[in-house]
């Protein structure tokens, strides 16, 4: 009898222990779940406020990642464009990057597996290219744009004694879309020389030199890493050989050389700002890459008239100032998780409608809805505007706005301005106006379309309250 009681007691104890364990496991699971939910909520909050992932078609400074960062300079690369955030924009294979070099900084020789198009935001420097069996040395300064072909070995330096050298660049990877690498022939621990990946036998045969000598040259540890500082006399020596046309160039239309956007006449200007551009007709290397570069200097309180590009997707990087942009978009309704769910539902509805049209002829009708994409922008912001998407950029009341634009797919592209003196809507003939606006409203439409006497760069929406980041 005692044995039965003992056995029963042990069974109850084991059952109690099991129940307690299950309770702890449940609590732990809930804690993990709460933690993960909290992380997701924090992530959603960051996205709503322009953090990682940002809002659709807009990326802030926090979306950049430092590839190199020393006291002498930084090289930062924007995260890859997520397809769900730039729907309709053919830019997934491109990357945006920013290079900043301190006074008298020197950048170690390297090459990218990507074509590079850059714009000098600030300062001056010397850029040396080693390619096709020759050396080309260029003096570049603020306002210059230039193309560097993939695979060219490049080294550069900030030639100013007190100003930083800052460059904004667009990279077009040639191996893997959206992914590029930098290769250093000379290095140590950071950066590592790519020659360190080869066997000693191969290197000794290739250079006809003993391993010990090769290590001294190619794998020597250098202080400061990829970006170092150079004595003033060495910077002067580097500057002596550089030119605006590229020493050793052929002088042909295919010659690589810097082109000044701000040194040429703007293609449009008025009291509200200036617009500059460098096209493929002026730079053959841009045409080959199907790219174009533009610069917009918008006076404070002014705006670019609502417009779209017929073929090109615009990648706009804010250089200076602040303001906001708005865009009409059929793909998304703003930003955040709720909008993504709505987008998915809308996508499902559209698929059903399209299937219905295929099955039942013309009885189905596609719903056309355009949503407002809007975000505040400041120095370092990146905006993506797909082809045919009407959009505008507005400078704040307090300061002017400078924006450099890279146009992807620019060959045969046209800009269409929808408001102002050059709006195509003004060209509607009278019968069309009566059909479009209604007979009684045709005259009123004429008055509305003719009310704006200016074009392209216009007076902004003054006196309508502050712009909130919706």
Swiss-Prot record:
Cofactor: Zn(2+)
GO cellular component, one term: extracellular space
Claim: Cell wall biogenesis/degradation is one of the keywords in the record: no
Keyword Glycoprotein among record annotations: yes
Span list, region Disordered: 36-57, 240-261, 330-368
Any single GO BP term: proteolysis
Role played: Seed storage protein. Globulin-like protein that acts as a zinc metalloprotease. May play a role as an initiating endopeptidase in germinating seeds.
This protein's name: Cupincin
Species in which this protein is naturally found: Oryza sativa subsp. indica
